[in-house]
């Protein structure tokens, strides 16, 4: 629930549930998820990220301090991820070209060859990284990536600006009224 719903609402339910739950193992697991979700709330520092790009170079999130970083956790086998690439990525990049945004694509579900083939096939421009192993990968764990596509916006200060950011097609169809628009336009 912490991954998909408003954190404030789930925090209330979590507090009430803790009062009545008698299964300590379940409570420990829930506490772990709560702690991870809590760390990802807007204003908190984004977890350190160190991944390899398609050329084998190590890339860190901290390399982009002073810029917005729109992170797209995606998968080669993810239909909705591919749909976004095909239908929105170019319009999205064009619309926001004046906002100093780095587009970071982190592939979580495949090996290196399939990932590189997908980068070429979908002409992914931006920072392309791989976090093989998905739920087992430390970056995916730190960012609480439970499903894909999963989007986040990191602020210019390196802190989380939006923990559950909308996908590009939703932002484009909002006509400038999305949370994404409010955050980036508020920085100019």
Residue ranges and their predicted role:
Residues 59-60, 161:
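Generic structural signal for well-ordered beta-strand positions
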Residues 153-188:
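Thiol-/selenol-based redox modules, centered on thioredoxin-like
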Residues 1-59:
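Oxidative protein folding and maturation machinery
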Residues 50, 116-157:
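Short, internal strand/loop/helix patches
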Residues 65-67, 98, 124, 145:
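Active-site acidic short loop of glycosyltransferases
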Residues 82-122, 134-141:
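Structural microenvironment flanking redox-active thiols in thiol-disulfide oxidoreductases
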Residues 65-66, 73-90:
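Conserved redox-active cysteine motifs that mediate thiol-disulfide chemistry
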Residues 68-69, 149:
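Alpha/beta-hydrolase fold active-site loops
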């Amino acid at each position: 629930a912490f991954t998909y719903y408003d954190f404030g609402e789930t925090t209330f339910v979590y507090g009430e549930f803790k009062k009545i739950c008698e299964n300590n193992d379940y409570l420990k697991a829930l506490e772990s998820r709560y702690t991870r979700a809590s760390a990802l709330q807007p204003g908190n520092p984004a977890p350190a990220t160190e991944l390899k790009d398609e050329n084998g170079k190590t890339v860190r999130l901290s390399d982009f301090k002073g810029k917005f970083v729109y992170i797209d956790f995606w998968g080669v086998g993810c239909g909705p991820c591919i749909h976004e690439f095909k239908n929105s990525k170019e319009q999205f990049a064009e619309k926001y070209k004046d906002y100093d945004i780095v587009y970071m694509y982190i592939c979580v579900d495949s090996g290196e060859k399939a990932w590189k083939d997908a980068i070429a096939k979908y002409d992914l421009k931006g920072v392309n990284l791989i976090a093989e192993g998905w739920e087992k990968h430390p970056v995916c764990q730190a960012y609480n990536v439970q499903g894909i596509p999963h989007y986040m916006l990191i602020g210019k200060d390196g802190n989380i600006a939006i923990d559950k950011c909308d996908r590009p097609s939703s932002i484009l169809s909002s006509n400038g009224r999305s949370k994404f628009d409010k955050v980036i336009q508020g920085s100019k």
